[in-house]
C-alpha cells in the first residue's frame, strides 16, 4: 500500500452550500483548491452528476498522486496532523476501511 493513500477520494466527498464538492471535510479549502474541477471549471452539484464529481480531474489526479506515493497539497490537513504525531482523518479512515484498500490500489 502506498504510504500516502487515503480511501476517502475513492468513496467520499464533502458538499458545500454553493453546490461545490471537495475531497473531504479536512481537505484544503483555500481558494477551493480541493474542490472538484474539470478543465479548470468547478464541477457543481446543481449542474453535474455525482459521477462527474468523483471522476473530475481533481479527484482523479489526487487519487493517482496517492497511488504514486505523493502527498497531495489538497490533503495538507492530514499531513500536518501526521507530521505532528496526531492521528489524522486519513489514518482513521484507512483503518476503518482497511478491507477495501486492496481494491483501490488497482485504479485511480
Question: Where in this protein do the model-derived segments appear?
Answer:
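Short, basic/aromatic recognition patches
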Residues: 1-7, 11
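Secretory pathway export signals and precursors
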Residues: 2, 20-21, 71-74
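Conserved alpha-helical substructure of the radical SAM core
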Residues: 3, 32-42, 81-108
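Cys/His/Pro-rich metal-binding microdomains
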Residues: 7, 22, 76
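A structure-centric signal for secondary-structure junctions around beta-strands
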Residues: 9-10, 18, 39, 72
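N-terminal pre-triad scaffold of radical SAM enzymes
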Residues: 10-24, 102-108
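C-terminal accessory region of radical SAM enzymes
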Residues: 26-80
Amino acid at each position: 500500500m502506498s504510504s500516502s493513500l487515503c480511501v476517502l477520494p475513492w468513496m467520499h466527498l464533502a458538499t458545500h452550500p454553493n453546490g461545490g464538492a471537495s475531497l473531504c471535510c479536512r481537505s484544503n479549502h483555500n481558494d477551493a483548491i480541493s474542490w472538484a474541477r474539470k478543465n479548470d471549471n468547478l464541477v457543481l452539484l446543481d449542474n453535474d452528476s455525482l459521477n462527474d464529481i468523483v471522476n473530475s480531474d481533481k479527484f482523479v489526479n489526487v487519487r493517482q498522486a496517492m497511488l504514486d506515493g505523493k502527498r497531495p497539497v489538497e490533503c495538507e490537513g492530514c499531513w500536518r496532523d501526521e507530521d505532528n504525531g496526531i492521528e489524522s482523518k486519513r489514518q482513521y479512515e484507512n483503518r476503518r476501511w482497511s478491507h477495501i484498500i486492496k481494491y483501490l490500489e488497482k485504479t485511480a
